[in-house]
Amino acid sequence: VVAESRALAEDALEKIIVDATPQPFILDAEVALLVTSVPVHPEHGSNLLLDRKFVWGPVDDDFNVAEHSLSFSVTWGRNSTVPIETFGVLAEWNGWDQMLDIWASIQMPKYADQITRSLNLPSNAIRVHYDVDVGGSYGVKRGIKHSVLVGYIARKLGCPVRLIEDRLENMRAGDAHGPERK
């Protein structure tokens, strides 16, 4: 929903009815990799993204002649962090210059590159204003999906668009969550 104010957007959201069929899901990554598991994207045929072996030198030979070897699995749990301030972004499209200006509470390398690639823009068609006061991120405010969305809408509508997460939005759908990994 795009609206002139947050109140209007929230009122409009109440009028939306979503008719969705719940899909099967798997929370354990190792179970998801089993051939018997339902693929997240059926057209891919499996839940495996990449199957590649990286080898530097005669690793198997080195292990065969080693007196001792150690094998173990490392797991760290899912985490959620709470930045002091939630993510905010403002985008403005200048149709004359074909330039997207982004102001965001971000401290991230390759931010501009990720936005231009997602929006299919040349890399010199974006100006990111990093001069916004930013604090309390602790490395978790990425905001790429927010910035791409706001940049797209600003370009489509031809007017400045901003998105400021509230705390509930940040906890539900922000970028401050890390998956469980093995």
Spell out what each predicted region is.
Residues 1-114, 139:
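Extended, polar/acidic
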Residues 76, 109-110, 133-135, 167-171:
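Short acidic loop-to-helix transition motifs that present clustered carboxylates
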Residues 1-12, 16, 138-182:
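Glycine-rich and small/hydrophobic secondary-structure elements
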Residues 126, 133-142:
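Glycine/serine-rich anion-binding loops at beta->alpha junctions
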Residues 93-97, 130-134, 167:
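Short, histidine-centered active-site or binding-site loop motifs used for metal coordination
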Residues 70-74, 102-104, 126-130, 161-166:
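General beta-strand structural signal in soluble alpha/beta enzymes
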Residues 16-18, 116-121, 179-180:
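Short, solvent-exposed amphipathic alpha-helical segments in soluble enzyme
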Residues 89-95, 113-125, 148-163:
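Proline/glycine-anchored alpha-helix kink/cap motifs
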